[in-house]
Design a protein with these regions (language model features):
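Gly/Ser/Thr-rich loops at beta-strand to alpha-helix junctions
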Residues: 38-39, 114-118, 178-179
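Single conserved hydrophobic/aromatic residue that forms the stacking wall/gate
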Residues: 1-13
């Protein structure tokens, strides 16, 4: 793999996509094995270079390089190193420093759909001061509770009930690799992407007019 191409490899068993993108380290690129919100029988690759996703032309270039590679190596060829590492603590520390105590007096329900969100989100939100109710935080590629696609409102029945039953302020449901969310308000209503965009925009405008 990468190490045979003289690259040093840092290996993490489970990782969520935003965490990989924002990790502050001298890492040239990343390869994530993920099918995102697709059914469990599918898989795929997400590739980044210098913390940016590869565009179509770059992906084609990677394909050509892969198809045309050779195994001819000189006798003094250096294989790269392969190291395991855990960046969760570093990621949480970085985010919590940027958003100090924003979760104070806030109660949320987090539905990780037995995917990568459960490894980070509950701990991160608690670090930010939130009271957290967890749903399906244990990773399981069979997705035994529901499909990890928060864009499909039918997958949000459990979190809707949990938000109301726990008198939470809102709920957040993640997809398979945690780069998309579904949001439930305090009354158990699903907030569409358009409504979320409006909320974000109003917050930005409010900051601009201060």
């Amino acid at each position: 793999g990468y190490s045979s191409a003289a690259s040093d490899v840092y290996k993490r068993q489970f990782i969520n996509y935003p965490k990989e993108i924002t990790f502050d380290n001298k890492i040239s690129g990343a390869l994530i094995i993920t099918a995102s919100h697709n059914p469990k029988q599918y898989n795929g690759l997400k590739m980044t270079l210098n913390k940016a996703s590869l565009d179509e032309a770059q992906i084609k270039e990677v394909k050509e390089l892969t198809l045309n590679q050779t195994n001819n190596k000189s006798s003094n060829y250096r294989f790269g190193l392969c190291r395991k590492f855990d960046i969760v603590s570093t990621y949480i520390e970085k985010i919590s420093q940027s958003f100090t105590n924003i979760g104070k007096n806030i109660k949320i329900v987090v539905d990780s759909a037995n995917a990568t969100g459960g490894l980070v989100a509950p701990k991160l939100y608690r670090e930010l001061g939130c009271e957290v109710v967890e749903l399906y935080s244990e990773p399981d590629g069979n997705f035994p509770n529901h499909h990890p696609n928060p864009s499909d409102e039918s997958t949000l029945d459990d979190i809707k009930k949990a938000v109301v039953q726990n008198n939470a302020d809102f709920g957040i449901a993640f997809d398979g690799d945690s780069d998309r969310i579904g949001v439930i308000d305090s009354k158990g209503n699903y907030l569409t992407g358009d409504k979320l965009l409006l909320i974000y925009a109003l917050d930005i405008v409010e900051d601009l007019v201060k």
